[in-house]
Amino acid sequence: MTSFFDSESPSNVAEYSVSELSGSIKRTIEQTFEHVRVRGEISGYRGPHSSGHAYFTLKDDRARIDAVVWKGTFARLKFRPEEGMEVIATGRVTTFPGSSKYQVVIDALEPAGAGALMALIEERKRKLAAEGLFDAGRKRPLPFMPKVIGVVTSPTGAVIRDILHRIADRFPVHVLVWPVRVQGDGACEEIVAAIEGFNALQPGGPIARPDVLIVARGGGSLEDLWCFNDEAMVRAAAGSAIPLISAVGHETDWTLIDHAADQRAPTPTGAAEMAVPVKADLEAQLASLSARLKGAAVRQMDNRRQTLRSLARALPSLDQLLALPRRRFDEAAAGLGRGLQMNTANKRRSFERSAAHLRPDLLTARIVDRRQRVVDAVNRAERIVERQVHRGAARVASADASLRALPSRLIGQVHRASDRVSAMSRRADAAIAADLRRLKSAVAAQDRVLQSLSYRNVLQRGFALVRDAAGEPVKQAAAVHSGMALSVEFADGRVAAVAGEDGTPSQAPKKRPARAGEPTKQGSLF
C-alpha cells in the first residue's frame, strides 16, 4: 500500500530554501535591472529626514514602486523633489530578502520634461494667487533714494559684481550683501533665511536696516532656477516688510518669486537701476528746478514791489493821517491836566474852609492824618495821571514811528492809537471822579464827627459854658473868686457876668413838681 503523500514519480525541480530563493531573486533582479530609468509621479514624499535620506513612491495609473535617494545623492540633485512632480529617475533596482520587497535606489533625478515642471508651477501659482500673495494692492512702491540696499545672492560670480558696479555708477549708497547659495541643496533655506534676517534688523541698530532688498541670480535652466519657485521662498518674499526686487534669470525667465515681489527686474543690472536713480540726472533736475524757482521768486518780488508802490502812492501822507489824532491827544492831555488841577484846588480850598471851623484841640491828630492821606491820594492821582499821559504820549510816538516805517499798517495803528487815547481819557476821568468821591466822603465823615463832638450840641440842651476873661473855659468852681469877670455862653449867645461872694442861697427855689408822664425839658450833661 502506498502513502497518500508519496510522489507518484520523482521530480526534476531543484529544491531551494527560503533564503536561497530570496538571494537568487535578489541577484537576478539586481543583475538584470542594474541600471534603469523609470518615469513616474512622486507620491508620499518624505524627506529629507534627519539622516539626510529621502523616501517616496514612483507611480503611474496602474502600479507603484518604492524609491529612495541617499544623502550623498540628494545633495547633488539640481532641484528638490516635491509631491506630485513627474520625474525620470535613474538608478538600480534592489530587493530586501527579509521582507520580499524591492525598490529603486535613485542615483539621478530629473523632471519629466519642462511641461511637467510648468504644470507644477501653474498649480502652485493658482494656489498662492488664491491666497492673495500676488495681489497688486499689497505691493509697495520702492523708496526713491534708499540709503541702504540689501542684496541676497551668491558672493561669487558676475551677478554681485554687476549690481555693485551699476549702483556705484548711478548713485553710490551703502550695500549689504547676504551671501547664499542660489542653486542646489539648501539654496532655498538660505535665501529664505536671508530675507527674514534682513527684515529682523532693527532701525538704528548696529547693522543698518536696508530700505530695499534685491534677490538676484543669473540665468539658467528651469531646473537651475527651481528653488525660486519654492512655496516657502514665495511666502517669505510676499511677507517681507522691506520692499523687494526680484532679479532671477534673464528677461524671459519667470519664477514665482517674481509674482510675489514688489518689483520684478529683467536682469540683476536692471534691479540695480530700479533701486537707485541716476545722481547726475537728479543734479541736473535740481539745478533746473532751482533756476526756475529763483526766476519765479524774482518775478514775484518784482510784481509785489510794483503793487506795493502803487498802494503806497494811493495812501495819504503820514502828516495828514496823524494831524487829527495828534490834535485830539494834545487837547485831551491839556484838558486832563487843567481839570485835575482845578478839581484838586477846589477840593483843597473846601477842605481848608472846613478845617478852619474845627477846634485845634479836638481830634487834631486824626485831622492831620486825614489831611495827609488826602494830600497823598491827590499826589498819587497826579502821578498816575502824569504817568498815563506820558505813557500815552510814548505809545503815540511809537505808533508814529511804526506808521512811518510800515505804511501798509498805518490806518490800523492810527485807529488803535486813537482807541487807546480814548480809553486812557475815560480811565483818567473815572480815576479822578473816584478820588474826588472818596475825598468828599472823607471830609463829610470828619464833619459829622466834629458835629457830633461839638460842645454846641450840649448848649442846645440847656447847659451854659462859663469862660474867664481870657476866654478859657472854667472847669472847676475853685477857679472862680469873688468879683471875677466871667462870660457865660448859652446856645443863643453870650452874657457877661461877675462872680459874687461864696455862700449858699438862703432859700433854694422851689422846683415845680413835674406832672406824671411829662418829660423834663432839662437834659443831662452826660
UniProtKB/Swiss-Prot annotation:
It is found in: Cytoplasm. GO terms for molecular function: exodeoxyribonuclease VII activity; nucleic acid binding. It comes from the Bacteria. CDD domains: ExoVII_LU_OBF (cd04489). It holds the Pfam family tRNA_anti_2. Residues 499-526 are annotated as: Disordered. The keyword Nuclease applies. Transmembrane segments: none annotated. InterPro entries: Exonuc_VII_L (IPR003753), Exonuc_VII_lsu_C (IPR020579), OB-fold_nuc-bd_dom (IPR025824). One of its GO terms (cellular component) is exodeoxyribonuclease VII complex. Belongs to the XseA family. Heterooligomer composed of large and small subunits. This is Exodeoxyribonuclease 7 large subunit. It comes from Sinorhizobium medicae (strain WSM419).
